Structures are given as C-alpha cells and as structure tokens.
Amino acid sequence: MEIGNVKADVNLVLNLREAERHRRYFDYFIDEILWLSFLGMSETSLKEEEVTLGGVKETREEECSDDKLVLDICLKRKRLDEEEEEEVVEEENDGFKTPTRPENRIPIVRECPPAPMKRSSEMFRGRTMYCRRRLSFLPEDDVNSFITDLQWRTTTMTIKK
C-alpha cells in the first residue's frame, strides 16, 4: 500500500461516511415506498376527476406517482403531529396563569450585589467560646475539696515499674 496524500485520503474517508449516511436515508425512503405499495398503491396510477365548467362535465385524468403520494402522506403526518402538539398545549392550559401585573414582577437589579465573604472568623470565635467556658457556679468549698482530693490521690499513688 502506497502512502499518498493524507488530505485526499481523509477526504475520501469522509466522503465514504457521508455516502453511507445518505444511503441509510435512501434505504429508509425505499422502505416507505415499499410499505405504501404493499398497502395497495401502485407506482403510477391514473387519477380521474369530474370538473363542471358551466354545465359541461369533463373528466380529467392525471398521473400520480408514489413520490407525490409519499410527500402528501408525510405532510399529512406532519400536520397530524402538529395538531397533537396543540392538543397537548391545550391540556396544559388548566386555568392558572403567571401574574403579569407590574407589582408582581421581579424588580430589575441595577447593580450587582457584593461578592460573598468568608465567615471563618465567626466560626473561629464560636469554637474558642466553647473551649473557654467559665464555670460560674463553683463555690470555694467545692473547689477546695476537689483540689484536696486530687492532692491526696497523687500522693498515695505508687508508680509501678
């Protein structure tokens, strides 16, 4: 295999991918035509219409191909889809509406609000307050008994080795 122009090779690959995509659309279109012909439509049929012009009746014959019929069917399907969407919109209209009076509108902000600030100092103060709690209910007798009890325990303890 020879190494050729890379740009041309890339374009060739892209063109092949594009052709594959179009082939899929073409296959889908052919499937639709086959489905319509399965329903009894021929590839080319004659259409007869009676036209009355001032009391003289004429019969016109026109050729209709499946392409026209397919386009008509697609347009009818599209119209039906649009009608279904309109019905859905009507179902959503349940009598409640967003108020539109000026007093119910959100005011226009002329200036941006200031940027949010860190609140670490408040959190730090809160922590220190919990750590430095003062005991205001201790009378001197309770404090003295507590201290003497601690002194007695420390003097009577023996260190084991």
UniProtKB/Swiss-Prot annotation:
GO molecular-function term, one example from the UniProt record: protein kinase inhibitor activity
Biased composition (Acidic residues): 84-93
Stretches assigned to coiled coil: none
Keywords in alphabetical order: Cell cycle, Protein kinase inhibitor
Keyword Transmembrane included in the entry's annotation: no
Stretches the record annotates as Disordered: 84-106
One GO process term, biological-process aspect: regulation of DNA endoreduplication
Free-text function comment from the UniProt entry: Probable cyclin-dependent protein kinase (CDK) inhibitor that functions as a repressor of mitosis in the endoreduplication cell cycle.
Protein name, entry field: Cyclin-dependent protein kinase inhibitor SMR12
Biological source species: Arabidopsis thaliana (Mouse-ear cress)
Phylogenetic placement of the source organism: Eukaryota, Viridiplantae, Streptophyta, Embryophyta, Tracheophyta
